[in-house]
Amino acid sequence: MKVGRTTNALLAFALVGLLFGCASRPTNVLLPVADTSPSSSKVEMLVATTRARSANPAEMYTGERGSAPSFADITVSIPPASVRKVGEVAWPKKLPSNPATDFAVVKAEELTRDGAKEWLHASVKKSPDHSVLVFIHGFNNRFEDSVYRFAQIAKDTGTDSAPILVTWPSRGSTLAYGYDRESTNYTRDALETLFQYLAHDPEVKEVSILAHSMGNWLALESLRQMAIRNGGLPAKFKNVMLAAPDVDVDVFRTQIADMGKQHPQFTLFVSQDDRALKVSRRVWGNIPRLGSIDPEQAPYKEELASNNVVVIDLTKVKSGDSLNHGKFASSPQIVQLIGTRMAGGQSLTDSRVGLGDTIVQATTGAAAAAGSAAGLVISAPVAMVDQNTRENYGNEVESLTGSQSSKKTNAGSKNCNLPVAPTKGCKK
């Protein structure tokens, strides 16, 4: 898809509200520092990426496409609650990062395929229910953005699942919408291969998937491919959480149909005042985006109910995010409340929330099974949008208005498949 000058202007106009009061921050923050803060907590994650490697160890991976998949073992130190609110990423104001006040990488090692499998097996054994959580980021994310965002989500939800970050080649630019979208297609087979491996690994008992924005397209397409190839999806794929999905609503209808009746529990987070998705709708021929539908209107209400899709409508939730594309980020108290309710096995309704703002469960039935998995369904998207990527928007708007931009161009390469061990249903 070609994104022209008019579309670029629309994107910049829609995002310009984020610029006010936004200070720039250091980039290339991933060079490990000494673990000097005993009060900080640690999040260990497995990274699977189709990005090209960077020559700069503080960047690790660029926004270009790698010729082969890569894996990494990353540990992020997160400062204590006394210096950070739930839903926030404490980006360093200067380098090196200070673990006492900032998110800081204390370990970053590339892994071989076998090393990645060893990491996964060891981490899954530490999980009480032998579960994994796969996170897939959205449009306009640098590698470090996705790492710190997922670390925050894992910390703020208190998940015991083994965390796997799937990060695809995004250039971290509002003017690279077309490139980013094609990069999700480029990564589709690789993600399916990872899903196939998780499905056939006997150590993994449960898989939850969390995707945001454009990352939902990648998640849904890979699940669809897997279902067609295998004649359905495995029972261990329990939860798929779609946060503000930038997906054509008509295409979603066909994707979920192709997965068959025995699909995971889908939870859809929507907001009709999502300005980013309004711009996307213009780009894609005025077709509604899944993340901004009115779930109470026909035909959506009936179709979602028939597919047992739980919808959480956040339209009336007040947000500090001027795009309304990541309301969990600016309303962390709501996420905490929802997570607490769901962890207790309680169904979410308007009256249970007990706040002035309204959260609507638009479909019938319970949100998911009781227990930790149920809590994860709702509480995981604590910060779907990383507010600290905003300086990118400033650079891109400046380039449109004729001002000088500080954006740098990365060099790149090509194709990938996550080379996990081939099993039945996996392509070699």
Question: Positions of the model-derived regions?
Answer:
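Bacterial N-terminal signal peptides that target proteins for export
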Residues: 1-10
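Long, low-complexity, intrinsically disordered segments
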Residues: 405-428
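The conserved beta1-alpha1 loop
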Residues: 134-138, 212, 244
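Gly/Ala-rich beta-loop-alpha elbow adjacent to hydrolase catalytic centers
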Residues: 211-215, 219
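Short substrate-entry loop that stabilizes the transition state in hydrolases
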Residues: 141-146
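Lipolytic serine-hydrolase domain surface
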Residues: 23, 27-110, 117-121, 126-127, ...
